[in-house]
UniProtKB/Swiss-Prot annotation:
Gene3D superfamilies: Aldolase class I (3.20.20.70). It comes from Pasteurella multocida (strain Pm70). GO terms for cellular component: cytoplasm. The active site is at D11, D130. Heterodimer of HisH and HisF. It catalyses: 5-[(5-phospho-1-deoxy-D-ribulos-1-ylimino)methylamino]-1-(5-phospho-beta-D-ribosyl)imidazole-4-carboxamide + L-glutamine = D-erythro-1-(imidazol-4-yl)glycerol 3-phosphate + 5-amino-1-(5-phospho-beta-D-ribosyl)imidazole-4-carboxamide + L-glutamate + H(+). It holds the Pfam family His_biosynth. IGPS catalyzes the conversion of PRFAR and glutamine to IGP, AICAR and glutamate. The HisF subunit catalyzes the cyclization activity that produces IGP and AICAR from PRFAR using the ammonia provided by the HisH subunit. CDD domains: HisF. NCBIfam families: hisF. It is an enzyme of class 4 (lyase). Its EC number is 4.3.2.10. One of its GO terms (biological process) is L-histidine biosynthetic process. This is Imidazole glycerol phosphate synthase subunit HisF.
């Protein structure tokens, strides 16, 4: 069994790390490079950076901080935001990113997944999915342009259909951002993760809802995810990564 991954997530806007609740009302957390350094030193397995308004603003990621991050950390990192072409991705890899993640651009142009996977290999291509549970219908929908709440919209894709589609097109990993749980620290949506896990034959990363160490344990044991991504609990030092890994080892979970 592969070791499970602990992945801090850094949402970036205007050159700063920010954090919202259910993708709204973002507060500034701090500067990108020192936070990245801190997490690498604390034992994170990987980092994910989302330039959250790049897609909704119609631009690509500011590459200057990507290069600075690559210079100061020695763990893999993934960047996302407004990547619409092989050329966009090429520049980010040249600046030191290990993986790229696409979300809204893939919904606008699903063939982008194929082109990126063909060019860079599936292992370098992550697809982020922003899911929203609609209580009235009991359905999980895929949302787009979630970095800007005024432009966020529900697509015609239901979650499980999109999960199948992105795998067929060459995604090497899926990060499932469960918007209903985001930032509220009540735990990952285990039922949703199980539904996706049953269909997902590539690494699956849970995102949205971590508030206590047991939430990570539940995602790993009950939903068998490959990694757990979290933001506010790490940013605000509610959970220490080293202590979290010790706890998970005691729970017999294989951790790096």
């Amino acid at each position: 069994m592969l070791a499970k991954r602990i992945i801090p997530c850094l949402d970036v806007r205007d050159g700063q790390v920010v954090k919202g609740v259910q993708f709204r009302n973002h507060e500034i957390i701090g500067d990108i490079v020192p936070l990245a350094q801190r997490y690498a030193e604390e034992g994170a397995d990987e980092l994910v950076f989302y330039d959250i308004t790049a897609s909704s603003d119609g631009r690509t990621i500011d590459k200057s901080w990507v290069e600075r991050v690559a210079q100061v950390i020695d763990i893999p990192f993934c960047v996302a935001g407004g990547i619409k072409s092989v050329e966009d991705a090429e520049k980010l890899f040249a600046f030191g990113a290990d993986k790229i993640s696409i979300n809204s651009p893939a919904l606008a142009d699903p063939d982008l997944i194929n082109r990126l996977a063909d060019r860079f290999g599936v292992q370098a291509i992550v697809v982020g999915i922003d899911s929203w549970f609609e209580k009235e219908t009991g359905k999980y929908w895929v949302n787009q342009y979630t970095g800007d709440e005024s432009r966020t919209r529900q697509t015609h894709w239901q979650l499980l259909d999109w999960v199948k589609e992105v795998q067929q097109r060459g995604a090497g990993e899926i990060v499932l951002n469960m918007m209903n749980q985001d930032g509220v620290r009540q735990g990952y949506d285990i039922a949703q993760l199980k539904l996706v896990r049953n269909l997902c034959h590539i690494p699956l990363i849970a995102s949205g809802g971590a508030g206590e160490m047991v939430h990570f344990r539940d995602a790993f044991i009950e939903a068998n995810v490959d990694g757990a991504l979290a933001a506010s609990v790490f940013h605000k030092r509610i959970i220490d990564i080293g202590e979290l890994k010790d706890y998970l080892r005691k729970e017999k979970i294989k951790i790096r």
